[in-house]
């Protein structure tokens, strides 16, 4: 919103606006530069840092303890920005250009060749009318469950050769390295996201990807429970139940011959099983055991993959809503008696 001079009331509006505009212009220049390194910084890193800083400034408008706090500035950016994007969505749809999804700062649009001129005209009109600028990337394919969980492949021109290359972008459950990008997400069986990727992009059967992995960490997940709980393993040894208290942060995988792991409330004794009550094996300390000896429950991971795939291919929700209609349309429901 630098174009409209949005700034915290207690700051010099012109100086603040010029700073934001400089960061925006620099980011666009860096992003489209042919240089791999700019001022000693890799091009992609430079562009990403500027994007994060610009977005962070908006976030600081709403932070009461911060030096940029201004509730009115927050509303000016939010409300006006959304209205401008809605105006663009409306114009595109009125011209039979499908808007696939929209969020706070951008749109995903499906443009056929015969609509390319209309699309360019509408974008130019919108930029002129609002004073905003629009940057676009071309998608090769999009596989999405919702706006927060998707796999996208972008067509990127190689800066040196000029050839088009495909660049992957993952978000949410589709990202095998989600835990590395956001430590709060925890570590959760990266093999699932990898198998889904191979299934959609390279047509590799889910079970093939699962069984080809030799790294037990691909199948592991972690659970960090609050201090009001402790973690217990329960297993059968020589026909008797044995219970052992584990550390609160536990790493485990699902197996065919393991044991149950539960978090137990320290006061009430209330219990809840990890991994939906499946048999698991705790592996807080990594060893060199062969993957075959782990006796991994591949069916569990297979089903987890299809929890992602089915909502996309069958048009149902992640919780399975819509299966009834699918069965009816497929003729899988038969009346007990004829009419």
Describe each PLM feature range.
Residues 1-339:
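Conserved acidic
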